C-alpha cells in the first residue's frame, strides 16, 4: 500500500518542478518548454507533474514569479516610504516597467498569457512553496501585487487618484484611462519582444521614461 506524501514531501516535489521550469525559462524559448521536458529535468514522469499542476503554461507562470524578485524588493522599499497616493502610483509603474522590459517574454506571458487571470492563485502558491522569497509590502501595495489580473492591479492603484488636484481622473473616465495605460504598456512590451527577436539593443531606461511620460499625459491636466 502506497504511503501518502507528507506536506514536506509534496512541497519538495513542487519545488523540483518549479526550479526545473525556471532553469528552462532561462535557457529556452517558451514554445520549447513542454511537460515531458520539465518532468525529465526534475527527475519524474510527466504523469506525476499533471497530478500537481493544471498544465505546462500554469507551471511556466508559477516559475516566472522568481523573475519578479527585484520588482517585489523595490515595492518593499517603497512600502517603507510615506509617499502620496499619486507618487506611489508613479513609482510602482516605474519599477514595474524597468523589470518588465528586462524580462519581456516572461512578463508578457504572465500578464497577457493563458493564465493571466489566475495571478492571485499563482502568487499565493509560489510563495507557499518558496516562503523565504516573499517580501513584506504595505497592505495597499500587497493588494495590488497579488491582484487577479493586470486590469485589477492597475485599477487598484489608479482609483485613489480620482479627484486629486492636477489630474483629470473621475469615476466616469477612470476605467478608460486604465485601459489606455494597459494597452500602451502592452504595446511597448510587444515592441521590446520584436527588438529582442531581431537582436536589436533595448534601452530599458529610455522605454520606461517613454511610458512614464505617456502615463502622465493620460492622467495629468497640465
Which role fits each region the language model picked out?
Residues 34, 108-111, 170, 197:
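Short, hydrophobic secondary-structure boundary micro-motifs
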Residues 77-112:
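Hydrophobic alpha-helical connector segments
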Residues 148-222:
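C-terminal peripheral helix-coil segments that are non-catalytic and often amphipathic
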Residues 14-22, 31, 52-80, 90:
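An amphipathic alpha-helix adjacent to DNA-recognition modules
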Residues 42-53:
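Short hydrophobic/aromatic patch on the recognition helix
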Residues 116-164:
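Amphipathic alpha-helical packing segments from all-alpha helical-bundle domains
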Residues 1-28, 32-41:
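Basic, helix-initiating cap at the start of DNA-binding domains
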Amino acid at each position: 500500500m502506497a504511503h501518502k506524501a507528507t506536506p514536506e514531501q509534496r512541497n519538495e516535489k513542487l519545488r523540483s518542478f518549479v526550479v526545473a521550469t525556471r532553469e528552462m525559462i532561462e535557457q529556452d524559448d517558451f514554445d520549447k518548454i513542454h511537460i515531458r521536458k520539465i518532468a525529465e529535468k526534475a527527475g519524474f514522469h510527466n504523469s506525476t507533474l499533471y497530478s500537481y499542476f493544471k498544465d505546462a503554461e500554469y507551471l511556466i507562470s508559477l516559475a516566472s514569479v522568481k523573475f519578479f524578485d527585484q520588482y517585489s524588493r523595490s515595492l518593499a522599499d517603497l512600502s517603507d516610504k510615506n509617499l502620496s497616493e499619486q507618487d506611489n502610483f508613479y513609482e510602482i509603474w516605474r519599477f514595474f516597467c524597468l523589470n518588465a522590459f528586462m524580462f519581456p517574454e516572461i512578463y508578457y506571458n504572465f500578464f497577457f498569457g493563458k493564465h493571466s487571470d489566475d495571478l492571485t492563485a499563482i502568487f499565493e502558491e509560489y510563495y507557499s512553496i518558496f516562503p523565504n522569497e516573499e517580501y513584506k509590502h504595505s497592505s495597499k501595495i500587497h493588494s495590488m501585487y497579488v491582484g487577479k489580473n493586470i486590469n485589477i492591479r492597475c485599477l487598484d492603484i489608479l482609483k485613489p487618484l480620482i479627484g486629486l488636484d492636477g489630474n483629470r481622473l473621475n469615476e466616469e473616465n477612470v476605467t478608460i484611462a486604465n485601459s489606455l495605460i494597459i494597452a500602451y504598456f502592452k504595446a511597448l512590451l510587444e515592441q521590446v519582444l520584436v527588438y529582442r527577436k531581431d537582436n536589436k539593443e533595448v534601452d530599458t531606461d529610455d522605454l520606461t521614461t517613454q511610458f512614464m511620460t505617456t502615463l502622465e499625459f493620460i492622467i495629468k491636466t497640465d
